[in-house]
Design a protein with these regions (language model features):
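Bacterial N-terminal signal peptides
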Residues: 13-23
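Sequence/structural signature of beta-propeller modules
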Residues: 29-62
Length: 471
């Protein structure tokens, strides 16, 4: 279902002209190329900056003029037992198209200018009813296939496979199993998004909400063929736990970093669970790692946040509410900071958002916190990346699960996800001051990261669909 607002039509012709020009330019080249203003991967690249420096159209001064360009909602369920068209994965924007998977198991290519469906493919859904999400959570990456020079969409699907799809029509180039063959597909779930770097693809697997636990792992594939190259297990054979439901980061030297989940049941040993692990990019052998100290552990205190590379550091927030900044070389703690409260039954995924890194500051979304004596259910703050010192902090009425995002115009978008009756929204914030510039009422939960691309803002609401905004 698609809605294009009348107010958008005067602007629409200009956007179509830009995208058409890009398409003609791409056609004249031997291979298409992702533009600097695109958002072609989860957290906008292997370093996970969540920052689009080249996209500058939306600024603090133009935010009041932001209007809805179009709104789209996926196809309803048509099969027995199929979940509805909720959106838990984030949009990927490349080459004039938006790619997104729905909870129904359908994966879509939409026209960036109008929201019209250009192609779709069904890739399955989980039969187990243990989580709200049973279809897509994994966010796609669009990258040039080294074997043919063509843009290709890589995505982890609900059926347990990593897919390579042609960006033109979503036809399949190859697929490779991520789940361990000795386990049924329904025991595993691909929360992780694929990270493409240096001719390889990295993706992790985890359980379906710990029911039951699975043996966590990270797998490396050849980008051109889908052949499995290496597999890192977080716990030894015979143990279950350490699921990787975050997405791997890659630094400028090619080293891979993975944050891991739940401690194995029935043992006091942690192995590589509840840790941030540095891995060899070719063999996935662990080179160094940080494990959350016993004094900071609690029941469900795993890492849901993906690691982010910033300067000489790598860091991620744990569900204990603490962000750990680690020296990349030694994986020792450079600094740590309590960002929000621990996870609870009512708010089970605290501090699961990755921060923004714009080259000078970190912007970290938190959960229940107190600012100047006032209690807030959520927050976002700007930090000095060298020390963790707070530069500004802004309270939000609800908690944050999806990572915040920022463009080169100095605007941050952060959505809230809360089970209370308090309305959720996407908040647009001035990156310089922390002032809330505008509240985009979404009418429901925002689990996915909003993204800035090609002068637009794309917000995916769990039950209300995908909305494109433009000034």
């Amino acid at each position: 279902m698609l809605f294009v607002t009348r107010a958008w039509w005067p602007r629409l012709t200009g956007v179509i002209a830009i995208l058409a020009s890009r398409a003609l330019t791409a056609a004249a080249q031997p291979a298409p190329a992702v533009a600097p203003t695109d958002w072609a991967a989860y957290l906008n690249g292997a370093a996970h900056s969540s920052f689009n420096a080249a996209d500058t159209a939306i600024t603090p001064s133009t935010v009041p003029a932001l209007v809805q360009a179009w709104h789209w909602k996926g196809d309803p369920a048509t099969m027995t037992g199929q979940p509805g068209p909720a959106l838990f994965s984030s949009p990927t924007v490349a080459d004039g198209a938006v790619y997104i998977g729905a909870n129904t198991g359908w994966f879509y290519k939409l026209d960036e200018a109008t929201g019209a469906v250009l192609a779709k493919v069904f890739l399955g859904y989980q039969p187990k009813l243990t989580c709200a999400a049973r279809g897509f959570i994994s966010t796609a990456t669009v990258a040039v296939d080294p074997s043919d020079g063509q843009d290709t969409v890589y995505v982890g699907a609900p059926d347990g496979y990593l897919y390579a799809l042609r960006a033109t029509d979503l036809s399949q180039k190859w697929r490779s199993a991520v789940d361990i063959p000795s386990q049924t597909v329904s025991d595993y779930f691909l929360w992780s998004s694929p990270t493409v770097a240096n001719g390889k693809i990295y993706i992790g697997s985890a359980s379906h909400c710990d029911k039951p636990l699975t043996r966590g792992d990270l797998v490396a594939y050849d980008q051109a063929t889908g052949q499995e190259l290496a597999r890192f297990f977080t716990v030894p054979a015979g143990f279950l736990g350490g699921g990787i439901w975050s997405s791997a980061a890659v630094d400028g030297s090619g080293y891979v970093y993975a944050s891991t989940g739940t401690q194995p049941a029935g043992t006091s040993q942690r192995f590589y669970s509840v840790s941030i692990v540095k891995l060899d990019p070719n063999t996935l052998q662990p080179l160094a790692w940080f494990t959350v100290p016993n004094s900071q552990l609690f029941g469900d205190g795993d890492f849901g946040a993906s690691p982010v590379i910033f300067g000489p550091y790598v860091g991620a927030c744990n569900k204990n509410g603490i962000f750990y900044a680690l020296d990349q070389a030694t994986m020792t703690v450079a600094w740590e900071k309590q960002i929000g409260a621990k996870s609870t039954a009512a708010s089970p995924a605290q501090c699961s958002a990755a921060p923004i890194y714009d080259g000078t500051s970190l912007y970290m979304a938190g959960d229940p916190t107190t600012i100047n004596g006032v209690a807030y259910r959520g927050s976002i703050q700007r930090l000095d990346p060298s020390t963790g010192a707070t530069l500004w902090e802004t309270g939000l009425p609800n908690s944050v699960i999806g990572s915040p995002t920022m463009n080169g115009g100095g605007v941050i978008a952060v959505g809230t996800y809360d089970f209370t009756s308090t309305p959720n929204a996407v908040y647009l914030i001035d990156a310089s001051t922390g002032a809330i510039l505008r509240t985009l009422t979404t009418g429901g939960y925002t689990f996915a990261q909003s993204v800035f691309a090609d002068g637009m803002l794309f917000t995916a609401n769990v039950y209300r669909g995908l909305t494109a905004w433009h000034v």
